[in-house]
Amino acid sequence: MNNSVDFGGRPFHFIGIGGIGMSALAYVLAKRQLPVSGSDLRPNHITRKLESIGAHIFSRQEASNLEFFGSKVSSTEIELNTQEMFPLGKSTLPQVVCSTAINSNNLEYQAAIELGCPILHRSDVLAALINDYHSVAVAGTHGKTTTSSMIGYMLLEAGLDPTIIVGGEVNAWEGNARLGQSPYLVAEADESDGSLVKHAPEIGIITNIELDHPDHYDTLEEVVDIFQTFAKGCKTLIGSVDCATVRELLRTAASDRQQPTITYSLHQDTEADYTVTNIDCRADGTTALVWEKGKALGVLKLKLLSRHNLSNALAAVAVGRLVGLEFGEIAKGIAGFEGARRRFEFRGEVDGITFIDDYAHHPSEIRATLAAARLQARPGQRVVAIFQPHRYSRTLTFLEEFSESFSHADLVVLTDIYSAGEPNLGLISGEQLAEKIAQEHPQVVYQPTLSTVCEYLLKNLRPGDLALFLGAGNLNQAIPEIITTLCEPATATL
């Protein structure tokens, strides 16, 4: 792929523009008044939003889509002719942006090669934007979206008007991206396909490191190598020493490269730069006293639940102090942050049943989310975990870990595996995972499809239940159907 990105007015065409990562980039480019087009086989509210700001969206993927900003040719034309499609020459060829999910058989991808279009991975575009700004890039196996969104919100509330690119939708800016008018950029930096190594921000954050994405990585050591390369490119590195792997990486960065490093921890005895005491996690939020190099800064209040979100907030505190904010400004921004969508998101309440949507799909994330749910649950209230496994490779790799992740749930409802495009090799199934979980947790029910999940829950949810829909697939599509059906004899709070 061509790594050179032209922000000088040359068009961008995104293959699969409706994806959460692709659409955020397209939004920022379109808001910068650059020509943007894209295709997606499943138009959604995100593609409609892009259309509203001037992007042209195709609902089919075909070669002729690439000529939208060139001369108009028929979509039925068989022969691709660069001179006919782009009479002003190759300088008008669009820059074609794709993600790892796009394979070489894609018609638009093949046409881009034949026409000689510059082909960019989405990480190339993000890396170029990171280089264009005073940038903060948030990396880590878990907590990237919440941490980057929180930092973005904090800077926004402090009047710094940042550009923000994250992997989830945030109500504060009604989407997964916003274009600011200041030199600041906050971005979520994804490690799933190894492209994290392309980013060289002024401030880099590593929240934690674990093995994940077994479709790309075989060992934890391979994951660490990617984060080490990312760390080398950061002018200043911030990380949590509560993760042993991050702690070692920070130590190496500080000693071998004399790189400025800033550390944070939930434990005051770690000698981290930012620590907390007096932690109080309650159903309505989390508070703690924040310390900076042994000096008390003040009390931090979060609307978000649990210790892992307090850790994310400490990363935000470190960034705020680094860019010159007073603690009062930092605390105000963090206190107002309500979280990102699909991150312990309240979706409704009907007949006393509370519905929560969460993106958790890794064993560690499930444990943390269910622990937060148990904290919020009232005495006697059931925590019902409805989980859709994500990818065959992840389910097989972490089979043992998944079986131990549901201890805080009173009832587990498991669906079949959401493939996310992976082939089913017959090595693992949702039913096998259910059987494995049942060895540790007796209250497990297997319901393979969204329709059977809905049927089961409508019959078995009780008033007072806290129902959590967990997974990175399409399980959350069942929530509106269940709420709507329950609403027929009652009134829901939405």
Curated annotation (Swiss-Prot):
Q: Name one GO cellular component term.
A: cytoplasm
InterPro entries, alphabetically? Answer: Mur-like_cat_sf, Mur_ligase_C, Mur_ligase_C_dom_sf, Mur_ligase_cen, Mur_ligase_N, MurCDEF_pg_biosynth, UDP-N-AcMur_Ala_ligase_MurC
Record's keyword terms, sorted: ATP-binding, Cell cycle, Cell division, Cell shape, Cell wall biogenesis/degradation, Cytoplasm, Ligase, Nucleotide-binding, Peptidoglycan synthesis
User: Key word Transcription regulation present in the record?
Assistant: no
- Pathway(s) it belongs to: Cell wall biogenesis; peptidoglycan biosynthesis
Q: Which Pfam families match?
A: Mur_ligase (PF01225), Mur_ligase_C (PF02875), Mur_ligase_M (PF08245)
* Coiled-coil ranges per UniProt: none
Give the highest taxon in the source lineage: Bacteria
Give compartment(s): Cytoplasm
Q: Which interval of the chain is the signal sequence?
A: none
Cite the EC number: 6.3.2.8
User: What are the GO BP annotations of this UniProt entry?
Assistant: cell division; cell wall organization; peptidoglycan biosynthetic process; regulation of cell shape
The reaction(s) catalysed by this protein are: UDP-N-acetyl-alpha-D-muramate + L-alanine + ATP = UDP-N-acetyl-alpha-D-muramoyl-L-alanine + ADP + phosphate + H(+)
Read off the HAMAP family from this record: MurC (MF_00046)
> Which PANTHER family does the record associate with it?
UDP-N-ACETYLMURAMATE--L-ALANINE LIGASE, UDP-N-ACETYLMURAMATE--L-ALANINE LIGASE-RELATED
Q: What is the documented function of this protein?
A: Cell wall formation.
What NCBIfam families has UniProt attached to this entry? Answer: murC (TIGR01082)
Protein name, UniProt field: UDP-N-acetylmuramate--L-alanine ligase
Originating organism: Trichormus variabilis (strain ATCC 29413 / PCC 7937) (Anabaena variabilis)
Name of the gene encoding the protein in the UniProt record: murC
